Amino acid sequence: AAKYFTHMVLKLEDKCRHIGRNLTLEATYSKPSAELINLWNHQVEMSPRYTARAELISEHEPHRAVMLVMADRRITDTMYHSADEFLDDLRVVQRSLAACGAVRAAYGPVQTIIWQVESFGFHMVEMEFRQHSVVHARALKDIHENGIHGDLQPMTREVIDTFRAIGSIQKRYGKKMAHRYIISFTKSAQHVADVFELAHLSF
């Protein structure tokens, strides 16, 4: 999970920075929208260091400056919490570019990165988990008899560890990266309920 996340974030950073460097549109001739100005003001509050650096190399080029700060936001204290948050900022830039007449930039490179984020998010792949319904039933029986912290069977421990791993992945990289769980040989609603109960007990 970490490998795919790191790979994707670095690729998006490179692409975002490349787009930003090529957005040489002076505010005098390509007036930024109020929405873009608000985004820039938010970036200034969030990181004076990043915005000062972007402004230094993008004087009077607000679209460029905003994109360069977006590219820098992969450090822990400033990084985007989700791909949707990153998409929101990209769309602000796109709408501003389109409104000021820079249609080729808005629906060319900016649209391309938007499609990429919509398709793959920050995760690139979606992990799938699968377990037999009988294993779930046996694990629950074991937990009910011995307690979640009791002397449990190795398979029960494996089931619990799996749910905890899913939770950890979702918390760190987003729910979309690990949101598919398949119950093999499901024959009743109880088999689905077992999974929810195990997930609840695991945390």
Positions of predicted regions on the chain:
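A short acidic (Asp/Glu
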Residues: 138, 189-197
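Extended, charge-enriched "interface" segments that sit outside catalytic cores
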Residues: 13-180
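Active-site-proximal loop/turn and secondary-structure-junction residues that shape catalytic pockets
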Residues: 130-133, 185-189
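Extended active-site and interfacial segments that coordinate phosphate-rich ligands
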Residues: 1-12
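Non-catalytic terminal/interface segments that mediate subunit docking, oligomerization
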Residues: 167, 199-203
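"Short basic amphipathic alpha-helical interaction patches in structured regions
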Residues: 129-130, 196-198
